[in-house]
Amino acid sequence: MGLRLYKPYTASTRNRSVSDFSEITEKKPEKTLTSWVFRSKGRNNRGIITSRHLGGGHKRLYRLIDFKRQKIGILGKVATIEYDPNRNARIVLLHYQDGAKGYILHPRGLKVGGTVVTSPEAPILIGNCLPLKAIPLGTEVHNVELYSGMGGQLSRAAGSSAQIVAKEGRFVTLRLPSGEVRLVSQNCWATIGQVGNVDANNIRIGKAGRMRWLGRRPKVRGVVMNPNDHPHGGGEGRSPIGRKCPVSLWGRLALGERTRKSKKYSNKLILKRRKASK
């Protein structure tokens, strides 16, 4: 799991890097675990853009990932490690002892031929899934449930993991990849280890066309628009934005304004806010 660099034959290869895909063992997905998903491309039912800068991109089949780890007490053997076009993390195809098959996120260090199990009494080994109350302090976990039985929602991106820092009463304290420290019910399940493909955030796109392959359209600066298109627009030549602070297309503060609801019930579960983005 590393990066492959290109010699600077062209301007795009000078600043381009890709994953070396050395951990991939199978090119074609398990057909029974794929489905077609309609991609809205940022449009609503009337065709109006509701999320900007989305559209196009290569065709994809969605892989049905088991975020709930529903096969409790049944041993699963790692058959393949596969590429998933819908996420930066790799996925693992498990063959269970009862004949079923399923995909999970690839934990770093798990290899073909290894075994994993979902159980409250499972050993603390990479890829095993347990309730948070059964996992020792200091352990790195991923695919953590926010609410018991709803499936993993936290720490699912490539290279991410959360750390168990305390246990008190009905709650377990987690330090999340963002730096946020929050309480989660001790009955929520989590998977041991860190998500694989840790170099994903070091990949350099290199050219605009590669972003289009990923389904991302160009982002135009507001300062080069007309005043009827953006609050920053207008002026003669290269003009400043003409405001005290940058704002969004709809006039809301663009830098630093908190967007989380102030009366959200789960605010009391957050002990430390996430680090401010740079």
UniProtKB/Swiss-Prot annotation:
Its main location: plastid. Keywords: Chloroplast, Plastid, Ribonucleoprotein, Ribosomal protein. InterPro entries: NA-bd_OB-fold (IPR012340), Rib_uL2_dom2 (IPR014722), Ribosomal_uL2 (IPR002171), Ribosomal_uL2_bac/org-type (IPR005880), Ribosomal_uL2_C (IPR022669), Ribosomal_uL2_CS (IPR022671), Ribosomal_uL2_dom3 (IPR014726), Ribosomal_uL2_RNA-bd_dom (IPR022666). Disulfide bonds: none annotated. GO terms for biological process: mitochondrial translation. It is found in: Plastid, Chloroplast. GO terms for cellular component: chloroplast; mitochondrial large ribosomal subunit. GO terms for molecular function: rRNA binding; structural constituent of ribosome; transferase activity. Residues 222-241 are annotated as: Disordered. Coiled coil: none annotated. It comes from the Eukaryota. Gene3D superfamilies: 2.30.30.30, Nucleic acid-binding proteins, Ribosomal protein L2, domain 3. Signal peptide: none annotated. PROSITE patterns: RIBOSOMAL_L2 (PS00467). Part of the 50S ribosomal subunit. HAMAP family: Ribosomal_uL2_B. Belongs to the universal ribosomal protein uL2 family. This is Large ribosomal subunit protein uL2c.
